[in-house]
Amino acid sequence: MKTIRLGTRPSALAMWQATWTRDALVKLGLDVEIVKITTTGDSKRHEAIVNLGAQGVFTKEIQGALLAGEIDLAVHSLKDLPVEKAPGLKLVASPKRADTRDVFVSNRYESIADLPPGARLGTSSMRRKSMALRYCRKRFPDEPAWDVRDIRGNVETRLKKLDDGEYDAIILASAGLTRLGFGDRARSFLDDSEFLTSVGQGALGFETREDDAETIEQVVKLRHEPTWLSVLAERALLRRLEGGCIAPIGARASVVSVEGAELISLNAEILTFDGAKDYRTQSLQVLRANANDRELPLETKEQLAELLGSNAAETLLDLGATGIVAEIQKSRAERAARLSAPPQK
């Protein structure tokens, strides 16, 4: 077996993910070399993600290295990986998912419910911003809204900005905070009923060249089937809504057992950018009706998971989310036009 060249971003969190992946593959008896690749998102740390334009600001250069044969395997934070398949590449597996929840981090307040009107709340996510504005509107209908500000940089940088007083609180992913050893900074978890998490949050994704059977054969050994089916459902939902990584869309799927039956459950919602309107849906897909039934082949389960996601998206559209999808697409087109316009003299 050849040495597997594993591509990753150079950030501390990405290196944690790559090191974990390398160690897991080494336990299978493989030789692995980590290759650091700087992406657009890394080189433009001070710009808001929504202003960087195209999808894949944290993945495009890594995928390019895969296609060029410079690496054999890429490890992504799955929430950063565009849902549209890249020609010549294949998403082949996800290991067991970490905590999917968002956390509230503050030096002054115990929970997001304690934030007063006008408080400065930092997040890099349009989804979190929309949900925070919705939550604030419900809590303080007659008071000034929170000042929800963009915050860029790695986890350590964001925590320093909080400690320096630039923000009263920030929202981060529990998985990243914990992986880097800062789990004790979380003051409380955000409830899924108000802050449904991002598609793929807490999960890693392994991507290879689709014709690299040798690498695929080894990497799929790291696949955690419940996680894999869950993220396939979530990504199918996002793909049908054409939302992209920055859209105010939340989704959380999980494989559950109920009285011997095996099911995939999916909660999903889409919001306007200002959080004033939202649509939600909950749905189930049966994988096995009872414990005595023959287990379905993985390929069939994958198809059912993706069908669940696309059907949930159709439900949201039927409920009235078409206008929000159009708003998202319009906003994306306007950003693309601004970025492609020649600089003014």
Predicted regions and their residues:
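Alpha-helical segments flanking ligand/cofactor-binding loops in enzyme cores
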Residues: 64, 112-113, 159-160
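Small-molecule-sensing regulatory modules
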Residues: 1-38, 43-44, 51, 134-345
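Short, small/hydrophobic-residue-rich motifs at membrane-helix boundaries and re-entrant hairpins
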Residues: 15, 19, 68, 77-78
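Short, structured active-site "lid" loops
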Residues: 46-73
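Paired acidic/hydrophobic, glycine-rich loop segments that form the ligand-binding mouth/hinge
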Residues: 55, 70-77, 168-173
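Extracytoplasmic loops/domains of multi-pass membrane proteins
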Residues: 65-67, 81, 309
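A conserved helix-loop-strand patch within extracytoplasmic ligand-binding domains
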Residues: 78-81, 87-145
